Amino acid sequence: MEKKTDEVFDALFKLEEIRQILRDSLPTGLDNDEKEAWKSKLSELNEIVQKLDSESVTRPLKKIAGTIEIRSREENYINIQPIQAAGRLTLEARKAIIAYGDGYSTCDTCRKPFRLDKISKPPIGDFHTELARFVNMDQARVVPGARRGFQAVAQTMVQRGDSVIVSSFAHYTEFLAVEGAGGQVREVPVDKNNLITADATATKIEDVIRETGKNPALVMMDHIDYQVANEHDVTGIAKVAHQYDIPFLYNGAYTVGIMPVDGKAIGADFVVGSGHKSMASPAPSGMLATTDEWAPKVLRTTQMVGDLTSRKFGVKEVEMLGCTLMGSNLIAMMASFPEVQKRTQNWDDEVKKSNYFIDALLTIEGSRVLSEYPRKHALSKVDTTGSFDIVAKTHKRKGFYFSDELSARGIVGEFAGATRTWKLSTYGLSWKKVQYLADAFTEIAEKYELPLKSKT
């Protein structure tokens, strides 16, 4: 059966038009004009539903508000975009967006002490407790993206001129968080296998002590880096940090929400996760978890008093700027959470799917994987300079021929025009889709007469 994506969106939007009638009406019910509008819209909806059950082809949907394209890549395509794969909303999260899309929708029943993590209806307070338990830490807060978690910790721990140890694969937001606090990043080099080791971290710490005369203020390290998606020895690195009495921040932007993370077993003082990258949540969303030892500092409450009014806001947490996610982002994050918890237990299967695809890609002569292999993550960096890029050199569309071929097979998310080094993720795809994806790549290779190896 042909997909009826446009009709599904048309029906959803028509239901919203019907919903608007309810919003415009009095609490006592619909007046005569509203009843007529209801009947008219319902008739239009029934026509759309009939089209859903027919083979007829209808016109494409109009744009939202006249200018915004309908985003249907998750319905119509296999999306391998690395930063989108684990952020796809669950069904329950999409329902939450519908019900809680209005501005401060979390605040309907906010009561004293007037703080987000204390709200009981919806159960936001309980969610904060569950988040901390999820990563085996003592306390947690939701934040507008992992970057705000980095920022909160850096502003707490780093003074002007302090050094902060980071990976040479560190994300730019880690740099900015340190810079904003007045600190200076000091990068640990990767080894020949593109891995950050505990020994290299210890050497860097010693270098900093020798040069500055004092310990770094913080060690901030990615478990899985975003550049080549290798797994780094965060447990060993945390142990080294603590040997020097330096607090350790675990960057779980590519782990929290997709694979099991035990903050205390790792030795983390702070765990930062990304909701929109790895927890099936809308952007911006994320989490910061910490221990009871560090919570009084990073979650400190304001002590400031107004000089004229004597006002004070004692329950508001300074680094959080008070409340953080006050609407549908948070509720969708909460709605996805049961499924997110469950899917972390299937991580081994996700890794198997990643290796299935990479194994298929490597049968195409000249293709390489730049990430550690066998894969330990669903995100991979590959090099097709010796395969698909050879075709690009003589093709009239250059590297865009490859995007054309993938798109024709219903695959999107690769960096358009890239045929040399690029990244993709198989996370969240069913086995049926992973097999289809692997077959599509070998089909394209065969079409352009690129030699294939036999599978081992």
From Swiss-Prot:
Positions bound to pyridoxal 5'-phosphate: A146, R147, N251, S274, G275, H276
Keyword ATP-binding in annotation: no
Catalysed reactions, semicolon-separated: O-phospho-L-seryl-tRNA(Cys) + hydrogen sulfide + H(+) = L-cysteinyl-tRNA(Cys) + phosphate
InterPro entries (UniProt xref): PyrdxlP-dep_Trfase (IPR015424), PyrdxlP-dep_Trfase_major (IPR015421), PyrdxlP-dep_Trfase_small (IPR015422), Sep_Cys-tRNA_synth_arc (IPR013375), SepSecS/SepCysS (IPR008829)
Co-factor requirement: pyridoxal 5'-phosphate
Name of one Pfam family that matches: SepSecS
EC number of the protein: 2.5.1.73
Entry-annotated residues carrying N6-(pyridoxal phosphate)lysine: K277
Transmembrane segment boundaries: none
Keywords for this protein: Protein biosynthesis, Pyridoxal phosphate, Transferase
Protein's UniProt keywords contain Transferase: yes
Entry GO MF terms: Sep-tRNA:Cys-tRNA synthase activity
Biological processes per GO annotation: translation
Protein's job: Converts O-phospho-L-seryl-tRNA(Cys) (Sep-tRNA(Cys)) to L-cysteinyl-tRNA(Cys) (Cys-tRNA(Cys)).
Summary of subunit composition and partner proteins: Homodimer. Interacts with SepRS.
Family indicated by similarity: Belongs to the SepCysS family.
HAMAP family on file: Sep_Cys_tRNA_synth
Protein name in UniProt: O-phospho-L-seryl-tRNA:Cys-tRNA synthase 2
Phylogenetic classification of the source organism: Archaea, Methanobacteriati, Methanobacteriota, Stenosarchaea group, Methanomicrobia
